[in-house]
Amino acid sequence: GVITERVQGDAVDAQVRDLVVKAIAQLGELGAIVSDIDIPLIAQSATISTAVTYGDVSGVHREGIDKRLKEYDYNLQLRLLAGAILPAQAHQKAVRLRHMLRQQILDALDQVDVLVTPTSSIPASPLPEKAGVESKEAFMEMLGGRRSFTAPFNLASVPALSINCGFTSEDLPVGLQIAGKPFDESTVFRVAYAYEQATDWHT
């Protein structure tokens, strides 16, 4: 099942889209029945994940935030502080939305064996010259998780993996994410292995 909004969405880099579409076509040539799947809440999955995880993590690290915040990595400091000021109502709503999203994903997996999306809306980034978030825009990207598409399957507690599906014109790798039913890792691995054997991205 192809999660259409994750492949054709405006946030997806054009080269990422092209490579993922080619990978999906390759799976079809290998015998997979390809169909489009709609998961309404998936567009909000990164925001849900941020509210759930940041709130939980800041609670666990409350003493560290109060007494030795500077000992944490700078990016982790930002996450902990964001979680510390998150209203309890927002966290509770995110937990409810997580359960709704999980049910939508499970309903989708009742129709297909696996779900496929890009792993990220952009290719793998070069290593930064220095750690830390250097702008408001970068911080909002981090909070919103606009680049990574792994959040929904983490929230749904279903197995997922990322496999290389090609390289951009700048030789940056692009990931194809394959997710399956709970406790059905074997199917996810079989799909990934079949794709890997039909391509040379892994060599």
Predicted features along the sequence, with ranges:
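Acidic helix-start/capping segments at beta-turn-to-alpha-helix junctions
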Residues: P40-A51
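Short, surface-exposed loop/helix-turn segments at secondary-structure junctions
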Residues: V52, Q92-K93, S125-R147
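Short helix-loop capping/hinge segments that flank enzyme active sites or metal/cofactor-binding pockets
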Residues: G1-T4, V52-L106, P118-I122, P159-P173
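Short, Asp-centered acidic motifs that coordinate Mg2+ and/or phosphate
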Residues: D113-L115
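Flexible, glycine/charged-enriched surface loops at secondary-structure junctions
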Residues: E29-P40
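Structural helix-boundary/capping segments
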Residues: G1-A11, V21-L30, Q92, Q103-L106, ...
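Short glycine-rich, flexible loops that bind phosphorylated cofactors or substrates
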Residues: G9, P123-A124
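Short, glycine/charged-enriched secondary-structure capping and boundary segments
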Residues: Q15-D18, E129-G132, Q177
